[in-house]
Curated annotation (Swiss-Prot):
A GO cellular component annotation in the UniProt record: plasma membrane
Biological-process GO terms, alphabetical: lipid A biosynthetic process; lipopolysaccharide core region biosynthetic process
Record key words, sorted: ATP-binding, Kinase, Lipid A biosynthesis, Lipid biosynthesis, Lipid metabolism, Nucleotide-binding, Transferase
Name under which the protein is recorded: Tetraacyldisaccharide 4'-kinase
Cross-referenced PANTHER family: TETRAACYLDISACCHARIDE 4'-KINASE, TETRAACYLDISACCHARIDE 4'-KINASE, MITOCHONDRIAL-RELATED
Catalytic activity: a lipid A disaccharide + ATP = a lipid IVA + ADP + H(+)
Protein family membership: Belongs to the LpxK family.
Name of encoding gene: lpxK
One GO MF term attached to the UniProt entry: tetraacyldisaccharide 4'-kinase activity
Binding site for ATP: S53, V54, G55, G56, N57, G58, K59, T60
Domain of life of the native organism: Bacteria
Organism: Mannheimia succiniciproducens (strain KCTC 0769BP / MBEL55E)
EC number(s) given by UniProt: 2.7.1.130
Residues in coiled coil: none
Task performed by this protein: Transfers the gamma-phosphate of ATP to the 4'-position of a tetraacyldisaccharide 1-phosphate intermediate (termed DS-1-P) to form tetraacyldisaccharide 1,4'-bis-phosphate (lipid IVA).
Length: 325
């Protein structure tokens, strides 16, 4: 929605509906907090990684970073997710690194591959947690998204903010991209700015990439060794991926943007060049292995998060678990 990032006449026309959306969502949150509507308390601490706005803000790299950081502190970690893009006939569903992305969803499969922790998907977060704990003991559970899922009680909250796009025109849906107003940041435990520091946070996440991996041969090659190619991305903010590639000196002859959680097929790429390198995100790659070509490369990224607030956040979780609170 391009008008979400400008204060156009369309946005102003939709403001009455935005007010209704905000009013209903705030009332719903208050009812959960007051205990009038029943919410679920898990037997282990829950950490929410979410955002205030619609679209790709970089939650998945943060989830992977968080899981690894907690593992390094000796904690057993599990992950739950709604599983956007999943076509499973049964929920809750345990997702492993070998799960078909069409069944498990691209992001849950990627998280399982990168962290090797148990992942469970379901729109019903309580059922996902219960199945997860039946399968493997967990000291803490990370929820990929779910900031507005107040039916699930939480112990810690992280919000990821896209430093480039911010909160768009500042309006709540449908006039703007916001699910909640920026004032919601005052009540979360950690705000991470994706890209650079901004007015909302000095805790910064940068996505570090050094090499590309061939989908067929598994060969690794430094990105600086490529001169040109084409690229596609089916993520929330494809331009960020293209800009990153260009930053390594790669001349992109063609770029293709797809919807987030796009379903890919061999037919979709029939007209793509079979000669020049073709780059994609790791999230997209998990769906493309069955029909990959030898000129296809995916680019793994690693979240680098700086700031004492992030260190303190991890320490607080570890302390909570060890104290049995």
């Amino acid at each position: 929605m391009k008008f979400w990032y400008t204060k156009s006449w369309i946005a102003y026309l939709l403001l009455p509906f935005s007010f209704l959306f905000w009013l209903v969502s705030q009332c719903r949150r208050w009812l959960f907090q007051a205990g009038i509507i029943k919410s679920y308390r898990a037997p282990v601490p829950i950490v929410i990684v979410g955002n205030l706005s619609v679209g790709g803000n970089g939650k998945t790299p943060v989830v992977i970073w968080l899981v690894k950081a907690l593992q390094q502190n000796g904690l057993r970690v599990g992950v739950i997710s709604r599983g956007y893009g999943s076509q499973s006939a049964v929920y809750p569903l345990l997702v492993t690194e070998k799960t078909d992305p069409l069944e498990g969803g691209d992001e849950p499969v990627l998280i399982a591959q990168r962290t090797q922790v148990p992942v469970c998907i379901s729109a019903n977060r309580q059922q996902a947690i219960e199945l997860l704990l039946q399968t493997q003991p967990c000291d803490v559970i990370v929820s990929d998204d779910g900031l507005q899922h107040y039916k699930l009680q939480r112990d810690f909250e992280i919000v990821v903010v896209d430093a480039q796009r911010g909160f768009g025109n500042g309006f709540v849906m449908p006039a703007g991209p916001l699910r909640e107003l920026p004032s919601r940041l005052d009540s979360v435990d950690l705000v991470i700015a994706n890209g650079k520091a901004n007015r909302y946070s000095q805790t910064v996440m940068t996505l570090a990439a050094d090499y590309a991996v061939n989908l067929v041969t598994k060969e690794k090659r430094l990105l600086t060794e490529f001169e040109s190619g084409s690229a596609f991305a089916g993520i929330g903010n494809p331009q960020r991926f293209f800009t990153m590639l260009q930053g390594f000196g790669i001349q992109l002859k063609q770029t293709y943007e797809f919807q987030d959680h796009q379903k890919f097929s061999a037919e979709l790429f029939a007209k793509f060049s079979k000669n020049e390198p073709h780059f994609m995100t790791e999230k997209d790659a998990v769906k493309c292995f069955p029909f990959a070509r030898e000129n296809w490369w995916y680019v793994p990224v690693e979240a680098k998060i700086t700031g004492q607030s992030a260190v303190n956040f991890i320490e607080n979780i570890v302390e909570r678990v060890k104290n049995g609170q």
